[in-house]
Amino acid sequence: MKRTLLAAALMAAAGSASAVGIGVRGGTTGIGGDFGIGIAPTLSARFGFSGLNYNRNIHDTDVDYDGRLQLRNFSALLDFSPVGPFRLTGGIVNADNRLNVTGRPSNGTYTINGHTYSSAELGSVDGEIKGKNRVAPYLGIGYGNVSGMGVNFYADLGVILAGGNKTSLSANCGAAIQGTAQCDQIQADAEQERQKLDDKIRGFKVWPVINIGVTIGF
């Protein structure tokens, strides 16, 4: 009898460990999906991708920008479920998340660092904001497992430890003032504008993760 019970328990554990599933999700890392595989009754591995492109106007500094947010996240995670569907999650994320900005003239002029230039003097202003750590740790909690049997709901709440942000901003002088003192002043103003952008995002050290989705397990 004991041998029969032990064999049944081992078979159940093996079945749980070999379960696989796929999930579709959306949230602050974009829209994407996961592939999950059970390793042990309380442990599973998950591999996923999510992405999104989003355009918006930005008016937070002297320059008005057209912004394009690009999210690209590949993840490799371990889910530990000590109590029912609730779990702890950790792993790494290849996080290529960035905001590209292009300055937009107002009535044919740019105002940068408090100085106004015509579009002939200042040809374009382009910048980028992205996380310092391209490959970053992930820590979080969640509900549900992608490798669970049947159709289920799952959710994640956590952070990508991006290590802060990097900013860049370039101002391209018009052909008529290339190599002049005015062009040097434009470059200095662009650096001051970059520092303003940097100051606004200095406190954002992590990327918040809030995702919900649906899984199908086999």
Can you say where each PLM-predicted feature lies in the sequence?
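N-terminal signal peptide c-region/cleavage motif recognized by signal peptidases
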Residues: 14-16
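Hydrophobic, lipid-facing positions within transmembrane beta-strands of outer-membrane proteins
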Residues: 31-33, 43, 72-76, 135-141, ...
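Outer-membrane beta-barrel "beta-signal"
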Residues: 77-79, 85, 151, 205-218
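Transmembrane beta-strands of outer-membrane beta-barrel pores
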Residues: 28-30, 49-55, 92-98, 145, ...
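Solvent-exposed loop/turn segments connecting transmembrane beta-strands
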Residues: 22-37, 149, 204-207
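Extracellular/periplasm-exposed beta-strand and loop segments of Gram-negative cell-envelope proteins
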Residues: 49-75, 97-136, 163-205
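Membrane-embedded beta-strand positions of outer-membrane beta-barrel proteins
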Residues: 22-24, 35, 47, 78, ...
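Outer-membrane beta-barrel strand-turn architecture
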Residues: 39-43, 80-84, 145-147, 218
